[in-house]
Swiss-Prot record:
Pfam families listed in its UniProt record: Ribosomal_S2
The name this protein goes by in its record: Small ribosomal subunit protein uS2
The organism's place on the tree of life at top rank: Bacteria
Family per record: Belongs to the universal ribosomal protein uS2 family.
GO MF annotations in UniProt: structural constituent of ribosome
Keywords tagged on the record: Ribonucleoprotein, Ribosomal protein
PROSITE patterns found in the cross-reference section: RIBOSOMAL_S2_1 (PS00962), RIBOSOMAL_S2_2 (PS00963)
Annotated InterPro entries: Ribosomal_uS2 (IPR001865), Ribosomal_uS2_bac/mit/plastid (IPR005706), Ribosomal_uS2_CS (IPR018130), Ribosomal_uS2_flav_dom_sf (IPR023591)
Gene Ontology terms: biological process: translation
Xref: PANTHER family: 30S RIBOSOMAL PROTEIN S2 PROKARYOTIC AND ORGANELLAR, SMALL RIBOSOMAL SUBUNIT PROTEIN US2M
Length: 262
């Protein structure tokens, strides 16, 4: 059973939003306070978003479908790949190609081309063609692999999509909404939560925060066959919470590792 504590969220800097001037007004309901012109997110609502997302993911997996992990920004790319691979799920971590969902059949043709080139490389075909042809095919394979490796084994549309930074991944969101694919996303203070089915209010820039959220989704997938849920431990009262926020703010943890103060 996954155990999430308020303290673990604080330690990851989940509660730090962007500068006050960058607020999307639709995020106001998720704001707890502000410190030094930085918005502080309401971790009670973050915990609820985690719980809702965890339950949605488990329903999707039990229905025999997959969750597509999406995060192409620098802070998220490696984490997205690691956690998607850990839970044996498809992922996009380099660039979202228009039509990955809405023009899925065409994308599958490109995937089949990639698989064919990979097969040619190992079945001896390359031994029978010129070096120039090999070079051309390798360039084509590398180009395809860069954007399609993570979805090579995604034979059908996913049952849900998990996104880091919905502002950056707007095309993916538009395609998922068009196809009525449920969207789970970490929503920072500069995001629009209304286009997300399961918004998780949180810092989508700091590496530790991104890693924590992505691991939670991966854990939900791995535990879907164990009939276990998620345990939320609210181990800080409001006074302690404010003290922790002040301490973290003083240490400037929000801007560590590509944090959120901009």
């Amino acid at each position: 059973m996954a155990i999430i504590t308020m303290k673990s969220l604080l330690e990851a800097g989940v509660h730090f939003g962007h500068q006050v001037k960058r607020l999307d007004p639709r995020m106001k309901r998720f704001i707890f306070s502000e410190r030094n012109e930085i918005h502080i997110l309401d971790l009670q609502k973050t915990l609820q978003g985690i719980k809702d997302s965890y339950e949605l993911v488990q329903r999707v997996i039990k229905d025999g479908k997959k969750v597509l992990f999406v995060g192409t920004k620098k802070q998220a790319s490696e984490i997205i790949e690691q956690e998607a691979r850990r839970s044996d799920m498809p992922y996009v971590n380099n660039r979202w190609l228009g039509g990955m969902l809405s023009n899925f059949n065409t994308i599958r043709k490109s995937v089949q081309k990639l698989k064919k080139l990979e097969k040619m490389e190992v079945d001896g075909t390359f031994d029978m063609i010129s070096k120039k042809e090999i070079s051309q095919l390798n360039r084509e394979k590398s180009k395809l692999a860069k954007n399609l490796t993570g979805i090579k084994d995604m034979e059908t549309l996913p049952g849900a999509i998990f996104i880091i930074d919905p502002k950056r991944e707007q095309i993916a969101i538009n395609e998922a909404r068009k196809l009525k694919i449920p969207i789970i996303s970490v929503v920072d203070t500069n995001c629009n939560p209304d286009v997300i089915d399961c918004p998780i209010p949180g810092n989508d820039d700091a590496i530790r925060s991104v890693a924590l959220f992505t691991k939670i989704i991966s854990d939900a997938i791995l535990e879907s066959d164990k009939e276990v849920g998620i345990q939320i431990i609210e181990n800080l009262n409001e006074e302690d919470l404010m003290k922790e926020i002040e301490i973290k703010n003083d240490k400037s943890d929000s801007i560590e590792e590509g944090g959120n103060n901009l």
